[in-house]
Amino acid sequence: MLLCLSPAWLMKVPAPGQPGEAALLVSKAVSFHPGGLTFLDDFVPPRRATYFLAGLGLGPGRGREAAELARDLTCPTGASAELARLLEDRLLTRQLLAQQGGVAVPATLAFTYKPPGLLRGGDASLGLRLVELSGKEGQETLVKEEVEAFLRSEALGDILQVAVKLSGWRWRGRQAWRLHPRAELGAVVDTVLALLEKLEEEESVLVEAVYPPAQLPCSDGPSPGPGLAVRICAVVCRTQGDRPLLSKVVCGVGRGDRPLRHHNSLPRTLEVALAQCGLGEEAQVAAVRQRVKAAAEAALAAVLALEAGLSAEQRGGRRAHTDFLGVDFALTAAGGVLTPVALELNGGLCLEACGALEGLWAAPRLGPAADEAVAAPLVETMLRRSARCLMEGKQLLVVGAGGVSKKFVWEAARDYGLQLHLVESDPNHFASQLVQTFIHFDMTEHRRDEENARLLAELVRARGLKLDGCFSYWDDCLVLTALLCQELGLPCSSPAAMRLAKQKSLTQLHLLHHHGPPWPAPSLHAVPCCPLESEADVERAVHQVPLPGVMKLEFGAGAVGVRLVEDAPQCHEHFSRITRDLQGEADHPGIGLGWGNAMLLMEFVEGTEHDVDLVLFGGRLLAAFVSDNGPTRLPGFTETAACMPTGLAPEQEAQMVQAAFRCCLGCGLLDGVFNVELKLTGAGPRLIEINPRMGGFYLRDWILELYGVDLLLAAVMVACGLRPALPTRPRARGHLVGVMCLVSQHLQALSSTASRETLQALHDRGLLRLNLLEEALVPGEYEEPYCSVACAGPSPTEARLRLLGLCQGLGIDGPSYPVAHFLSHFK
């Protein structure tokens, strides 16, 4: 991230192939480094900006220069002069908030002269009256009638004062309001008429209610001084999926008989401000905070909806969007309920006030309200939009298309502007129509991966593909992908590391002998096991591995064929069954049988099961996300339920992340997005297996929903040799608890009460989160989950109870599939 203190440090150059747009180049800037270090850097040649946020000041000077720099850029911009003008029009924003956002605004009478098109034709709002003037002179009679009716209207309630002010971007910060008692009709009319003379087109004169200080119920402490008013400033940011998120709330407290503004009061937290005014009861303060959050997020949602209907010219460029918003509220007591009333929208002032609060020497003592930097969600949005800019147009080769559960890949690629080229064994795969280039190549026999990698590299070169990266998210194709990257000179973890992680017994045995340094060593997390290729291997293994144990396919996926075995006869019986039923790819496509059907026996460890999804770049851990799994239906190990974020204590969560990270490094996995399955035992984390690719099932979707981090985008960036900029301590925006549906257990429900259409309709209404994992309802002995159904909530308990009720109503819960038991780990 770079800070440019002068417009002269930046320049715009025409963008080739994009008429009317320009690239922004940086020749000089302040750069920031860990430990608080800053440097003034000169860039030769200049660097290309991938995101621009301008400080749009008022009037001539640098603000105007910054506005011109921000216009019509090829890179994303977080503000523009055109959007700022809209937000600085109090009348327009009040109408927008009242009509679109359902946000309380002051009762307002507006006299507008040649109003902008966005104001025309809007539905009338309660307490918001627009009077369109044909001219600025000769309006005395109309003004008097309208003002008199307004001052007598019920919309003002018990208001004793009104303010008269000008509205329009020209007047922002340049004029003081004029206060009048409500009873002084003549004075109000005279002020309105005087201000009408200053109007230009698309400007207005506002007569608005001035709310007295809310009479807060006193706490147990001494009564506060009379007449204290609270002005609340909320900063809200645009996050993943254009969803508003409250970032921080800061308040000012002052005398109620004087205008309370940003620079004439000290910033403080909402809790401190309300306590100074006599409200210290925790539940009431929490209720006020929730109302402020709802109103602020609704305000930004209304602004984003307005922007969606604007042309690129009206926004100031194709890539111009409002990424953050400051909303100023007055706190009123309407009907005995403390209600925030939106006064105006701004950006810089609210952000500045929050920064001032964070900069106080006592900030570390302020508690949870000061834990997160106000700019954190904004910076995440900047980085996300910057990443999209970097990746747009990148040429990527995808090896293996996968099934219906991976349909999101093609949708996301279109959204990100990626140019995908696909290698796939199925010539009729639906994804063949969704890519730039389709290469049909039979790669089902993975014991020929080295030969196939050379052949594929020749095909890529013959087609003249200029690739930026190559990656796979499909288990069967991971080693082939690493070999192909090696042939093409593209970034990837080494083939040796991929082979080590792909073969489960090899993973465990390698890590068992990895004693460090560094310490704690990966050997602490590995589990004793024995590879099985024959009945003789089984006989030897039952004497080497403590029983009960777990038998599974060496190269398997989706827990197919995984079984708890109690003694030697069960081991022999299960080995015989698997070698008979699952001999090749045709017996069960997509679970690794192209590698053969060798098995392993590993020690069964007691404990709770967890997934850790990691993003690594150059051997450094960039991000980690931990989720919890419910108890499985022994002797099988098909997943039943899951919860995110984890309910583990912070120390245990850190142990899981470090164990997963060390196991990946121990296998040589240095670059990529990986999924590591572990159990937390009394002695610490124990490794189940490493999946050297992005987590499957619902994981990418849940992480995107809760944290705003897209593992797919991170994976393709790493594949292109680009380091993803991810939040080091991402905040979850809620909780998700889900349950798997199996055809063997839910065929009747999935064909009736919980049909695909019913589940999709509930998903579309936001009542559940559906992740479809299979296309058809086909029962079988060796099955994978058909779908995942989840519910969201502000707490794991609420999400769990919602899901349980839903499963009972849909027929997913039952005696043979006790959902309450599967969710019991999440209490």
From Swiss-Prot:
Q: According to its UniProt record, which cofactors does this protein need?
A: Mg(2+); Mn(2+)
* Residues involved in Mn(2+) 2 binding: 689, 691
Residues involved in Mn(2+) 1 binding: 677, 689
The EC number(s) given in the record are 6.3.2.11
Where is each ATP-grasp domain found?
516-720
Matching entries from Gene3D superfamilies are given as:
3.40.50.20, ATP-grasp fold, B domain
Q: How does it assemble?
A: Homotetramer.
Quote the function comment for this protein.
Catalyzes the synthesis of carnosine and homocarnosine. Carnosine is synthesized more efficiently than homocarnosine.
- Listed name of the protein: Carnosine synthase 1
- Organism field: Homo sapiens
